[in-house]
Amino acid sequence: MAYATSTYARTSCIILPKIQNGAHFTDDTKAFRRITARRVTRIYASQGPTKPSKPSPGVDTRIHWESPDEGWIGGRSDPAKSVDEDKTNLLSDEKFAELIKDSFDSHYQFLGVSTDADLEEIKSAYRRLSKEYHPDTTSLPLKTASEKFMKLREVYNVLSDEETRRFYDWTLAQEVASRQAEKMRMKLEDPKEQDFRGYESIPDMVDRLGGRNMELSDQAMTALTFDILIVLFAVCCIAFVIVFKDPSY
């Protein structure tokens, strides 16, 4: 009996520690899982977003434009060529030609040629007018002929050179366009507003004379003298009646 009791006690002593060790092992496993999950989360957070994958070495990812000079800064463009193209487009514009034709008192009108005249027409007009305005062959007064001949040489120097003629045409078109814009603005404005803008106050007579008396004309002086004589005659008549006339009469 004693042997059986001691055996049960020894067995219970062996089983209880195993049960306690098993519960402790379960708790340790849960704690280890929590720690592992935290570490994995920290690793993922520290790595950040994933970078895009690089393209293959043989793949061209650039943007291709239809023109090699389009879409790129510092393309292969010639500044002189661009300026020449702009001038050509400007001179070939119909509106530009109309502006030059609408001008008045221009070099073309002085020569008597059209705005699109070529160099031969300009030379022919210059030779014709030089004979007319030259001081030795002119029928005009010498001063007038000299002024016109000097202007003729200036006009020919401007229109005979291609560059100076382009610049002159450009300035002439700008002048005509500005004048047309001013006319359009005047048409759109209110007439009453135009009258108000052009109104100038007329100062009083005293303000215009600066405080001085106005000078009288000869006719005004004659009329004033006649008025004074009439007043004096009336005064003399009254005095005569009062002094020399008999009161009984």
From Swiss-Prot:
It is found in: Plastid, Chloroplast thylakoid membrane. Residues 106-172 form the J domain. One of its GO terms (molecular function) is quinone binding. The chain crosses the membrane at residues 224-244. It catalyses: a plastoquinone + NADH + (n+1) H(+)(in) = a plastoquinol + NAD(+) + n H(+)(out); a plastoquinone + NADPH + (n+1) H(+)(in) = a plastoquinol + NADP(+) + n H(+)(out). It comes from the Eukaryota. Disruption phenotype: Malfunction of the NDH complex. The keyword tRNA-binding does not apply. Pfam families: DnaJ (PF00226). One of its GO terms (cellular component) is chloroplast. It is a single-pass membrane protein. Residues 1-45 form a transit peptide. Its main location: plastid. Keywords: Chaperone, Chloroplast, Membrane, NAD, NADP, Plastid, Plastoquinone, Quinone, Thylakoid, Transit peptide, Translocase, Transmembrane, Transmembrane helix, Transport. PROSITE patterns: DNAJ_1, DNAJ_2. Its EC number is 7.1.1.-. Residues 44-84 are annotated as: Disordered. NDH shuttles electrons from NAD(P)H:plastoquinone, via FMN and iron-sulfur (Fe-S) centers, to quinones in the photosynthetic chain and possibly in a chloroplast respiratory chain. The immediate electron acceptor for the enzyme in this species is believed to be plastoquinone. Couples the redox reaction to proton translocation, and thus conserves the redox energy in a proton gradient. Required for the accumulation of both the NDH subcomplex A and NDHS. PANTHER family: NAD(P)H-QUINONE OXIDOREDUCTASE SUBUNIT T, CHLOROPLASTIC. Part of the chloroplast NDH complex, composed of a mixture of chloroplast and nucleus encoded subunits. Component of the electron donor-binding subcomplex, at least composed of NDHS, NDHT and NDHU. This is NAD(P)H-quinone oxidoreductase subunit T, chloroplastic.
